[in-house]
Structure formats: C-alpha cells, structure tokens
C-alpha cells in the first residue's frame, strides 16, 4: 500500500532529527549535511536504518537545505543532491513494509517579500526545482518542514502541488504566543495550509506553547 492509502487509517511514525545524528557521526560545524550524501553515504543510511529499526515508518531525505541558494557557486546541482539522498533513503527502506521516504524541504534561509528580499515567484521556482527532482528520483511524499513564514509556506505548497501528485505534509513552527514569524495564529495558519491542499499538517519546535493549543487544530 502507498503512503496516501495509509494516511488517516493507521498510526504512522516519522523519524527524528537527522542533523544532530550526523553530528554525532562526525559532521563538523559549518559543514553542509547534504554533502554527506556523497562523502558519507553509509553513515547517512545508518541514521535512516536506525530510525526504521526503532519503529519509524517515514524517514526524511537528507535534503533539508538542498536548494539552489545553498549551493550557489558550488560545482553541484540540486538534482544531484536530491537524487543521492533519495537513493540512500530508498536503500534503507528496501525490503521493509510500510516504510516511506519523504523528500524533506526546509526554509530557503531567506525571508520572502515584503518582509525580505526574496520574490515570491522565485521562491516557488526554487521549491519547484526540488520537488521535480524528488518526484523523478522516487520520493513517496513531500515534507515541507519547520516553516514560519506565511509567504514561504504558500510558495512551497504551490510548488509541490504544481510539480507533482505526491502527498504533501507541512509542519509549522510557532512562537510562545502561538504565532508564526510573520504573525499568523494557529487557526489562520492551519486554514491557509488546508486550503492550499496539504494532506496533513503538523507543528514542531514551538516554545512554551501548550500542546493542546496547537493539537486541537492540527
């Protein structure tokens, strides 16, 4: 069965952090985790397998920052990074039932206009490039993770919906007042994400915000 067939019918568990696990294996401060898909593929796969062996159903590809802005000026392409990451993830899932690889998309690192200088259309294009690569290389779903900018959430979701037919999950980050960085409250943020067609919505890394204040809406 595919991921969408199980969503909402069974409890499915995501893995945990990838970056801190790679740090424990030797990733140095300032080193790009995504480059380990080429230089330390066995270590990246071992992280995925550890989570799967302990009950996770969904592993996140090592692509949190795999956007063209991050690799500007480097002799490497987004497609190469995404392809290598998904190859590792799919190898970790091989032979397992109910094991899926999510293409993991994090923030670009820039605020979108009008709060910052990244145009909305460019953000859509940046995410679209990653989504197309993920779909081409066999991702089971798209995870848009740890988002706090309303405009960037819209850009990433539109890119996902326009460039693939995979299930899309969005996780949001709220501050201690239950607000996104750009000011939307929980209800408004959830309504927006739901309206844009996300298959599931979650909350991560909120500070002092009681679980029931987000959980009631997600």
Specify the residue positions occupied by each region the protein language model found.
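N-terminal small/glycine-rich loop or linker at the start of catalytic domains
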Residues: 4-39, 64, 68-70, 97-120, ...
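Conserved, mostly hydrophobic/aromatic
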Residues: 16, 51, 89, 142, ...
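Glycine-rich, proline-tolerant flexible connector loops at the mouths of alpha/beta enzymes
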Residues: 32, 36-39, 58-78, 139-154
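Glycine-rich anion/phosphate-binding loops
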Residues: 36-50, 74-88, 121-128
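Catalytic domains of carbohydrate-active enzymes, especially glycoside hydrolases
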Residues: 46-59, 137
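Alpha-helix-loop-beta-strand connector modules within alpha/beta enzyme cores
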Residues: 74-96, 154-170, 216
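Conserved anion-binding
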Residues: 111-113, 156-161, 165-193
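Conserved small/polar residues in nucleotide/adenosyl-binding loops
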Residues: 207-214
